[in-house]
Amino acid sequence: MSATSVDQRPKGQGNKVSVQNGSIHQKDAVNDDDFEPYLSSQTNQSNSYPPMSDPYMPSYYAPSIGFPYSLGEAAWSTAGDQPMPYLTTYGQMSNGEHHYIPDGVFSQPGALGNTPPFLGQHGFNFFPGNADFSTWGTSGSQGQSTQSSAYSSSYGYPPSSLGRAITDGQAGFGNDTLSKVPGISSIEQGMTGLKIGGDLTAAVTKTVGTALSSSGMTSIATNSVPPVSSAAPKPTSWAAIARKPAKPQPKLKPKGNVGIGGSAVPPPPIKHNMNIGTWDEKGSVVKAPPTQPVLPPQTIIQQPQPLIQPPPLVQSQLPQQQPQPPQPQQQQGPQPQAQPHQVQPQQQQLQNRWVAPRNRGAGFNQNNGAGSENFGLGVVPVSASPSSVEVHPVLEKLKAINNYNPKDFDWNLKNGRVFIIKSYSEDDIHRSIKYSIWCSTEHGNKRLDAAYRSLNGKGPLYLLFSVNGSGHFCGVAEMKSVVDYNAYAGVWSQDKWKGKFEVKWIFVKDVPNNQLRHIRLENNDNKPVTNSRDTQEVPLEKAKQVLKIIATFKHTTSIFDDFAHYEKRQEEEEAMRRERNRNKQ
């Protein structure tokens, strides 16, 4: 590349350009005016170097390469995309000074006329500087590099495209009436625009490169910055700038009630919300004591006042709420609702009580006959009706024939076998006690029949009964006959059982599982006896422990307490069975 020297002469002289290392023909001679488009950018660049006092002066080893092409002849379209920054090389590191990459991040465009230099790099003339767009002006680029810091340069695009006004030290617009913010750099101007709520919602949003009108810019300027008089700029301190964001705070006060506490005194809505969960006429939450019995749903709906009364007062009101006995077929409904008032205060000694379907009131006493005096407080005297009195002779007859819960039981077996029986429901337990029979599954019947035959009368075969999910054993019976596989009892709650054998009930009492859980069976993976399957055999030594605990346990409840209830259920099931058989015919 040949070295060319250009004489800088005043504009208008017609001197020729002298070129070294070559001759010039007449057709190659050019005037100074021909270099005007190319020399304009070089002239601007000669005055664009920062002073020596700038702490961010670039290293003089980094060459300054100008952009060799001019965009003065290119057409300017306002509908194009945003300008792409001109990426330059890295500045050299020297003397420990800070150097930055003068790319699109730091090198920000200046006025619309040209781009200000950054760290000694040449500007990039994004907007053309010909006469067609002389209204924008380029005079602001000459003294722009004389600012105190390299960070003072900021965007010079039209204010509507950036949402703020042009700061001091930037190039303005030739025919624009915008006034500059005095003494505020780009960083300070950015801080003034930090507003939480923002009152510039009405401002027109523009993108870089769109057409702007002077009236639109004037309206935006009035919304973004306060009006400044044409007098001398007043020095602005940081304290004054810090006070500016506090102006829109009164508009944000309603937003503070949402839940973000910004003030020292809570707003009234928060105080009102603290009363959630209380009654409208009272200020305290009405809660029942932890030890108070839980009232049934009907009692709470009818009279909510007993919630805060002592338990004796609550129990005394129950006969008034249910003065008339319901129909016999409704016996199963009211009794479970009234039973908690009677049983729960006195049944603290019960452990792992099965809540369903045992809690149906002490309609019968296991030591004496049935009578109206045996009904507890709050229990509806349903069994006193003529239809329920028919059940009492059945229980009395059973107690007269069988000596239930004997005190002289010999649990120390020398020869015998013991099996676990798991029943699906207490209905079948009731009918087994009533008819002295039992039936297991097909596999269970075979196992029990083989065990009974193996003893050959040399010892008893005891069955330990427990209902699935009850949490207790309900009694002990002795197997008295072999299994009749062809017999069909027709009394069970489910019609799928086939076969039967005779049993004799010895103990009828509820023994909680926690009384027997410590006894483990080595023939059942060392599991507790309470976790056994149906017809699971208990080894003789472990069976002695189980029989001893059941025989000596002082029980408080048994299935006899609900005997009348299960009698009524059996009558209903038989009536439904007869109805189905009649429909089949």
Swiss-Prot record:
Question: What induces this one?
Answer: Following heat shock stress.
Q: Tell me the leader sequence span.
A: none
Feature: compositional bias, Low complexity: 329-351
PTM comment: the record says: (Microbial infection) Proteolytically cleaved by HIV-1 protease when incorporated into HIV-1 particles in a nucleocapsid-dependent-manner. Cleavage by HIV-1 protease probably ensures optimal infectivity of the mature virion.
What are the protein's UniProt keywords? Answer: Acetylation, Cytoplasm, Host-virus interaction, Phosphoprotein, RNA-binding
Modified residues annotated as Phosphoserine in this record = S23
**Record bears the keyword Cytoplasm:** yes
Give the multimer and partner information. Answer: Interacts with CNOT1; promoting recruitment of the CCR4-NOT complex. Interacts with YTHDF1. Interacts with YTHDF2. Interacts with PAN3.
What is recorded about the domains? Answer: The disordered regions have the ability to interact with each other and to 'phase separate' into liquid droplets within the cytosol following binding to mRNAs containing multiple m6A-modified residues. This leads to the partition of m6A-containing mRNAs into membraneless compartments, where mRNAs may be stored, degraded or used to transport mRNAs to dendritic arbors in neurons.
Q: What is this protein called?
A: YTH domain-containing family protein 3
Q: Which organism is it from?
A: Homo sapiens
